[in-house]
A protein has these predicted regions:
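Catalytic-site microenvironment of enzymes
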Residues: 1-244
Length: 244
């Protein structure tokens, strides 16, 4: 137990040092920050990170064995991520701040609400000048309860693949300690990622179908670790060395 606490303390210390160092690099180089092609000519050159906590409200997403819904975990990690990015001087927006669907009122069926929710999220992202989208999700594969680890997926916009690879490079040593993963292009079936003009990365933080990983994903300390790794990866990408 003592060894576990020491390892966890070292991890948090390492992440904190990375955040401070990368924050300094980012702030020093913000005047020459990279501007994605799709965002040029939209006003300020400063990027805004749109954080998207997947699902919400009646659409709980994947469900852990104990009944915990993905949407609540997504929101908790997203709020931690927002705090870290703001601390580093990054502009942020969230598609939702509560456990609710982002759909139009008065819709009768769940299908109508889900379609509206995705359309509204895409419209929100496309309305933010010079945006970068980070969509936070949890995975599930009930047919293989031992499957675990975090993985990133990128859309077709310029810079997205590099960002996904940078985030994955941080997630592998931090949380994928037994099995490294490679980032992948997002499937065409994922509506939001394929209907935004911004570079977008979807982060599957873990598998709720894996009992041990589901328990970790519900722990605040683990959520903070994930948020810190994602924030540090974004800042590293923005610093310029991993954009191509």
């Amino acid at each position: 137990m003592i060894l576990l606490i020491r390892k966890r303390t070292l991890l948090y210390t390492w992440l904190a040092v990375c955040m401070i160092g990368l924050s300094a690099i980012f702030l020093a180089g913000s005047r020459r920050a990279f501007t994605p092609t799709g965002a040029m000519g939209q006003g300020s050159s400063a990027q805004t990170v749109v954080i998207d906590p997947g699902h919400g409200g009646q659409d709980g997403g994947a469900v852990a064995g104990d009944g915990t819904e993905e949407s609540r975990i997504n929101l908790a990690i997203s709020l931690q991520l927002e705090q870290l990015l703001r601390f580093a001087g990054v502009r942020t927006e969230l598609t939702r701040r509560e456990d609710v669907m982002v759909c139009d009122p008065g819709l009768e069926t769940m299908r109508q609400r889900k379609v509206s929710d995705l359309h509204n999220r895409a419209s929100f992202v496309n309305g933010v000048p010079n945006a970068v989208l980070l969509s936070i999700h949890q995975n599930s594969l009930p047919s293989s309860p031992v499957t675990h680890v975090a993985q990133t997926f990128w859309n077709r916009q310029e810079g997205a693949e590099a960002l996904a690879r940078t985030l994955q490079a941080g997630l592998n040593p931090a949380v994928n300690t037994h099995r490294a993963k490679e980032p992948k292009p997002i499937p065409d079936s994922i509506y939001l990622m394929n209907h935004v003009d911004a570079p977008a990365v979807l982060v599957e933080c873990g598998f709720l179908s894996n009992r041990e990983e589901a328990a970790r994903l519900q722990q605040e300390d683990y959520q903070k670790t994930l948020a810190a790794v994602i924030a540090a990866g974004y800042l590293r990408w923005m610093a310029g060395e991993d954009r191509k």
